[in-house]
């Protein structure tokens, strides 16, 4: 039975050494050991190593006299405190991260000479940072936004950073427009509102004037923008990259991360409530999953396009606002990534980690995607100001496990004591070291792909980038009816927040009407605007009418209800046998049942024993759970039926389409009818049906009935 920790720790918990994930290690984690610090059993000292006798009082002239400037202990402490904060990331400021490893499924030497993709026995350390885009460090986790999905591979050949998102496209095609887009989506400059959202005039003014954003905005208005968990979202490299094998043969590829937990989202009402009830909902979910041993896992795959097939599609592979539909080019699995250890210190690891798309290794190379080309500059440039200079690669979390010797010297925060007299190349003084490494099939120096280029310098967008609506239409028409309704409601909500009617009308008439007239008409009706009769441009036909891979409904996952949080509501008089039976049944499926009571105090079961609860129903409301069960016990269910808090908990769970196990009397009292996910018993048959309903994430068939519930 779950219980709270009540004893004070005998050892320091600063490093979290008591949790199972701390036993997991790899080459990168071992290298970080040099920099870890645990103060257990140590004297309090100044930064200069002087022991401190009194850390409670500043040095004064008499007990009530003036403080003295000579108090070097106070001055050091206050000065350091005054400078603890560093500039936050311009975008993706709000984030969290974890350590883990990548393991290739086999030898992919036919595709690339990158060493970490050639040995199935090789464990490559990784560090992953997930983030939102718009909001500052203190913004909410559950806002409607793109999620960053950045992975740093610490390979034997150097660091490889795959800096992607949970959506496979972006808002713009050329990096020169990135400052304009970010200025538009960020809080408006006159009042710094809104925080963490795009439902405001400047964003919709920009995207309604920039049709290339139409496809990405469709993704942002879908359920993909409000993931249930960071563990339950896909990741994408966004751009087309090249993989090159030892023979110099290149292939175009798109990178994909497929979560074993499936692709699942919050409901919009849940997302808004969670932003207030638990701002840290998603980072807490990731932390607790790893701490409990429910290690998140993704499969890395690539869509492979031979160079000879570059132009066989009705879109341009270099256009970052386009996908390659998986029905045209299936995803080839390469390996798996497992996140199995939480950071020891958030600032040192998550805040100071520096990703850059330009961090690649032999066997991987860029393409001429104009957004990617700008990112190659921007990421390094921003780290220099954010992390205090060009030596940010020496920060422990950023250091490669591969050795790095070169002639880059000095600058702010230099940590390396370089030996020798020659800091240039070639030299004869230090034996010519360090020396270049010729390119080779294995363990060679990096060699850029020898792409032939014959062109005039010109500021012009390729005509092949000109179709802005066919893939947005493909996305919408690939959604289930439920997902389509969520998109309609999202557009209506966001545009309903826009103050200027001409912006709302322009988005409906010049963007949505070119995607789908039914979509445009539905949004127009919700905004009180006339429905457009036709689009404003001739939209190209797509090679596909639908792409089933785009619908989340087709990505249920492969781990059942492992790691899913189930609320078990109890009050005094609960049947102990029923509780025990339900807990054991859920734990058998590796779910995480949690006992919740009217308060945080233990409840008395029918056998006379005190049952400890993990939280109160007020402290952990229904929006934090994937399912709800109520054990039998008349006194307990009567108490819940009489509690406004419990009734709200249950009605809200029903409204949010959660799977539920209730007594018949309790359901009748709440006015709820049995359905595929509302079971009116606690026997094994009901538990089995409950598990199946939780696997489906929501009881979608209930959505129409749930609209009438006022929770």
Swiss-Prot record:
CDD domains: catalase_clade_2, GATase1_catalase
Superkingdom, natural source: Bacteria
Region Disordered, annotated ranges: 1-27
GO biological process: hydrogen peroxide catabolic process; response to oxidative stress
Catalytic activity: 2 H2O2 = O2 + 2 H2O
Cellular component per GO, a single term: cytosol
Key words of the record: Cytoplasm, Heme, Hydrogen peroxide, Iron, Metal-binding, Oxidoreductase, Peroxidase
Pfam families: Catalase, Catalase-rel, Catalase_C
Subcellular location: Cytoplasm
InterPro entries noted in UniProt: Catalase, Catalase_AS, Catalase_clade2, Catalase_clade2_helical, Catalase_core, Catalase_haem_BS, Catalase_immune_responsive, Catalase_large_C
PANTHER family reported for this sequence: CATALASE (PTHR42821), CATALASE-B (PTHR42821:SF1)
NCBIfam families in UniProt: PRK11249.1
Official protein name in the record: Catalase HPII
Native species: Pseudomonas putida (Arthrobacter siderocapsulatus)
Primary gene name: katE
């Amino acid at each position: 039975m779950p219980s709270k920790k009540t004893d004070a720790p005998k050892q320091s918990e600063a490093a979290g050494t008591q949790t199972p994930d701390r036993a997991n290690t790899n080459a990168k984690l071992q290298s970080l050991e040099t920099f870890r610090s645990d103060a257990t059993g140590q004297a309090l000292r100044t930064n200069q190593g002087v022991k401190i006798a009194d850390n409670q009082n500043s040095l004064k002239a008499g007990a009530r006299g003036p403080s003295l400037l000579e108090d070097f202990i106070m001055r050091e402490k206050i000065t350091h405190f005054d400078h603890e904060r560093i500039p936050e990331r311009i975008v993706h400021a709000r984030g969290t991260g974890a350590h883990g490893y990548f393991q290739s499924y086999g030898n992919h030497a036919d595709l690339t000479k990158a060493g970490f993709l050639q040995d199935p026995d090789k464990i490559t350390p990784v560090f992953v940072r997930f983030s939102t885009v718009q909001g500052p460090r203190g913004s909410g986790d559950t806002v409607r936004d793109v999620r960053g999905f950045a992975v740093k591979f610490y390979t034997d050949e150097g660091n490889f950073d795959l800096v992607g998102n949970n959506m496979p496209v972006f808002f713009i095609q050329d990096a020169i427009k990135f400052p304009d887009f970010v200025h538009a989506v960020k809080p408006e400059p006159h009042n710094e509102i809104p925080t963490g959202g795009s439902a405001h005039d400047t964003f919709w003014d920009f995207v309604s004037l920039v049709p290339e954003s139409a496809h990405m905005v469709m993704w942002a208005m879908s359920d993909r923008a409000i993931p249930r968990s960071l563990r339950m979202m896909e990741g994408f490299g966004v751009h087309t990259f090249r993989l090159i094998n030892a023979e110099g043969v290149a292939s175009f590829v798109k990178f994909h991360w497929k979560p074993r937990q499936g692709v699942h989202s919050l409901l919009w009402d849940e997302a808004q409530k969670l932003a207030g009830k638990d701002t840290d909902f998603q980072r807490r979910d990731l932390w607790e999953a790893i701490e409990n041993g429910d290690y998140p896992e993704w499969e890395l795959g690539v869509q492979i396009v031979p160079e000879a097939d570059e132009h066989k599609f009705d879109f341009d592979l270099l256009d970052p606002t386009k996908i390659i539909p998986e029905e045209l080019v299936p995803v080839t699995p390469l390996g798996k990534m497992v996140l199995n250890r939480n950071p020891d210190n958030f600032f040192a690891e998550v805040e100071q980690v520096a990703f850059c798309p330009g961090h690649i290794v032999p066997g991987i190379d860029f393409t001429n995607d104009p957004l990617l080309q700008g990112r190659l500059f921007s990421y390094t440039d921003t780290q220099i100001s954010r992390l205090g200079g060009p030596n940010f690669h020496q920060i422990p979390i950023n250091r490669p496990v591969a050795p790095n010797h070169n002639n880059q010297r000095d600058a702010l925060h230099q940590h390396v004591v370089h030996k020798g007299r020659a800091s240039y190349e070639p030299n004869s003084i230090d034996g010519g070291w360090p020396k270049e490494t010729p390119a080779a099939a294995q363990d060679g120096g990096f060699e850029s792909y020898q792409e032939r280029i014959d062109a005039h310098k010109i500021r012009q967008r390729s005509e092949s980038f000109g179709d802005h609506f066919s893939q947005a239409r493909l996305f919408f028409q690939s959604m289930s009816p439920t997902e389509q309704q969520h998109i309609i409601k999202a557009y209506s909500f966001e545009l309903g927040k826009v103050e200027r009617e001409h912006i709302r009308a322009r988005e409906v008439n010049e963007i949505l009407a070119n995607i789908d007239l039914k979509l445009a008409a539905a949004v127009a009706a919700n905004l009180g605007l006339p429905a457009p009769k036709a689009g404003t441009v001739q939209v190209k036909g797509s090679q596909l009418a639908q792409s089933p891979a785009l619908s989340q409904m087709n990505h249920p996952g492969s781990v059942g209800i492992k790691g899913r949080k189930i609320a078990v509501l109890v009050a005094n008089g609960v049947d102990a046998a029923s509780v025990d039976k339900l807990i054991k049944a859920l734990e058998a499926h590796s779910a995480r049942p949690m006992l919740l009571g009217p308060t945080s105090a233990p409840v008395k079961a029918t056998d006379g024993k005190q049952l400890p609860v993990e939280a109160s129903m007020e402290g952990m409301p229904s929006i934090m759970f994937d399912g709800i069960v109520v054990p039998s016990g008349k006194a307990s269910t009567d108490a819940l039926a009489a509690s406004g808090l419990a009734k709200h908990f249950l009605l809200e769970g029903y409204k949010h389409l959660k799977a539920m196990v209730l007594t018949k009397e309790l359901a009748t009292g709440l006015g709820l009818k049995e359905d595929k996910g509302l079971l009116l018993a606690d026997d094994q048959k009901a538990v089995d049906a409950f598990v199946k309903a939780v696997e489906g994430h929501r009881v979608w068939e209930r959505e129409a009935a749930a609209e009438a519930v006022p929770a």
